[in-house]
Amino acid sequence: MKNRYIQQFEDAQLKDKVMPQFKAGDTLRLGITIKEGEKTRTQYFEGVCIAIRGNGVDKTFRVRKMGANNIGVEKIFPFYSESLASVEVLRVGRVRRAKLYYLRDRRGKAARIKEIRH
């Protein structure tokens, strides 16, 4: 059970940031703000959301993409991170699992996720 004051502080933090609705299996395009000395720039990371865990301020999601030479790259992002400039849902995937860790073992066409057509 959290302290009442901690809960009020966390609720105030959550009000500021609005995130789009997405789930595991969706393809996301994340804009990450990177500060290098005096300059700031936005770097984009595009991949499949393979897991969402936690709740409240501690909620995180894991995104996986295939990098150069077919090397898988996974990054974990806090939902309410200040470094996330933008989150865009590119495709809505059709999966039956909440955690898609089995995609780590798949290669090529076997690693694809079916898209929900509207």
UniProtKB/Swiss-Prot annotation:
Is Ribosomal protein tagged as a keyword?
Answer: yes
Q: Which Pfam families match?
A: Ribosomal_L19 (PF01245)
Q: Name one GO molecular function term.
A: structural constituent of ribosome
| Cited function | This protein is located at the 30S-50S ribosomal subunit interface and may play a role in the structure and function of the aminoacyl-tRNA binding site.
Asked whether the keyword Ubl conjugation is assigned, the reply is: no
What's in the GO CC field?
cytosolic large ribosomal subunit
What family, per the record?
Answer: Belongs to the bacterial ribosomal protein bL19 family.
The alphabetical list of record keywords is: Ribonucleoprotein, Ribosomal protein
Note the coiled coil stretches, chain numbering.
none
Please give the name of this protein: Large ribosomal subunit protein bL19
Q: GO terms for biological process?
A: translation
